[in-house]
Structures are given as structure tokens and as C-alpha cells.
Amino acid sequence: MRTQVTLGKEELELLDRAAKASGASRSELIRRAIHRAYGTGSKQERLAALDHSRGSWRGRDFTGTEYVDAIRGDLNERLARLGLA
């Protein structure tokens, strides 16, 4: 089935970066995201995903606190631009 979805510039840029990094199409990434968000993946699939993410912070030159602060800063800037802060 085919459907049409309107994305903002930021969402499209995120999707394009993920597509380039993974080699998957936009459509495939959207299908995967829908499956993760709304699907009924098995316990084994969820555990495999957790196992796959192990060590993802290895080699980073910043702490978790610094990362969260940076994200919050970006969020606050976006909210201010939208007049929501």
C-alpha cells in the first residue's frame, strides 16, 4: 500500500542522513520505525536490539551529562524559535 506523508525540513534531513549512513531507502527506514514504534516484536528481537547497541558510547570524548546538556540546549533553542519557550 502506498501513502503520502508530509515531513518538515528537519525530519527530512534526519531521514536522509540515516538513509545515507545505513544504505536503506527512506521508505525502508520509515517502515522500520513504524514497526519499532507500533509493531509487536518478539522478546528475542528486543533483546537482540539491546545487545546490538552495547558499547555504542565507547570512544566518545564527552560524558553522558555533557550530551544531555547539549541536547537540552538544542531543544531550548528550537522551542524559543517556535515561540514555545
Swiss-Prot record:
Keywords: Toxin-antitoxin system. Gene3D superfamilies: Met repressor-like. Transmembrane segments: none annotated. InterPro entries: Arc_rbn_hlx_hlx (IPR013321), CopG (IPR002145), Ribbon_hlx_hlx (IPR010985). CDD domains: RHH_CopG_NikR-like. It comes from the Bacteria. The keyword Protein biosynthesis does not apply. One of its GO terms (biological process) is regulation of DNA-templated transcription. The keyword Chloroplast does not apply. Pfam families: RHH_1 (PF01402). Antitoxin component of a type II toxin-antitoxin (TA) system. Upon expression in M.smegmatis neutralizes the effect of cognate toxin VapC19. This is Putative antitoxin VapB19. It comes from Mycobacterium tuberculosis (strain ATCC 25618 / H37Rv).
